[in-house]
Design a protein with these regions (language model features):
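Metal-dependent de-N-acetylase/amidase catalytic core
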Residues: 1-14, 97-215
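Generic secondary-structure boundary/loop-capping signal
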Residues: 85, 90, 182-184, 188, ...
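Active-site rim/loop-helix segments in enzyme catalytic domains that contact anionic ligands
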Residues: 1-111
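Single conserved hydrophobic/aromatic residue that forms the stacking wall/gate
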Residues: 214-223
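Charged, amphipathic alpha-helical interaction segments
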Residues: 76-80, 199, 218-219
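Conserved residues at the C-terminal ends of beta-strands
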Residues: 47, 86-89, 118, 175, ...
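Generic hydrophobic alpha-helical membrane-span motif
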Residues: 25-28, 140, 222
């Protein structure tokens, strides 16, 4: 929607992802640009990230703690307003009514103009990102939370008891690839910040992976 047609300029965004580092792999430069331009950007993570390790000495509780710390450091680099950890167990996420309610609560609390989230459909051409069940569940629950749950007063009326009035999100952006995309963000000048944010996830990302990403990511990023 053109700025001239909006009741108020867009200035608040919410990014809803399954795991710590999902946003950094998909839309970190967009988040960095928004923050630099004065937007309030909140990141909501659905899972605790407690399964992403091949270290036989690592425990789920310890990994969850490490990844939460890494995400907070990344958020500082990007300039995010807040990070919300919903804390669902990693790798077991399903688009339940409870997850939808928990996401809708944050939508009502932070009242974003734009929500950025994951695609709810499986991409069989993607070996990792597009086929992870937590990503699919997050996309489905986030879309349902935006519409109709966060919008409708009589859905989960207990949220009203928490002082959270309904909220209508202006736009939803789905991260993805070139095919079928209809919205592009020029992130020229923000890739270095995005790479530094990705490097904060030391338990998940090797320096070689960050270097490779730096060389191959385009400067116009799809959101």
């Amino acid at each position: 929607m053109p700025d001239s047609e909006r009741e108020e300029p867009y200035s608040r965004a919410m990014v809803i992802m399954a795991h710590a580092d999902d946003a950094e792999w998909t839309c970190a430069a967009t988040m960095a640009k928004m923050c630099a331009e004065g937007w309030e950007v909140v990141l909501v993570l659905c899972t605790d990230g407690s399964k992403g390790s091949d270290d036989p000495e690592m425990t789920a509780d310890r990994l969850a703690e490490i990844r939460a710390g890494e995400q907070q450091e990344s958020a500082r680099i990007l300039g995010l307003k807040d990070v919300v950890f919903l804390g669902y167990p990693d790798s077991y996420l399903e688009p339940t009514l409870q997850l939808r309610k928990d996401i809708a609560r944050e939508v009502r609390r932070h009242r974003p103009h734009v929500v950025i989230t994951e695609p709810p459909t499986r991409d069989i051409d993607s070996r990792y990102y597009g086929s992870h069940p937590d990503h699919l569940a997050t996309g489905e629950a986030a879309l349902a939370a935006v519409f109709p749950t966060a919008r409708d007063r009589l859905t989960f009326p207990e949220l009203l008891d928490e002082g959270l009035e309904p909220h209508k999100v202006g736009e939803v952006w789905i991260v993805g690839g070139l095919e079928g995309s209809d919205h592009f963000i020029d992130v020229d000048g923000y890739m270095e910040t995005a790479m530094e944010a990705l490097k904060a996830h030391r338990s998940q990302v090797s320096p070689e992976a960050v270097s490779y990403t730096h060389l191959t990511l385009p400067t116009k990023r799809i959101v």
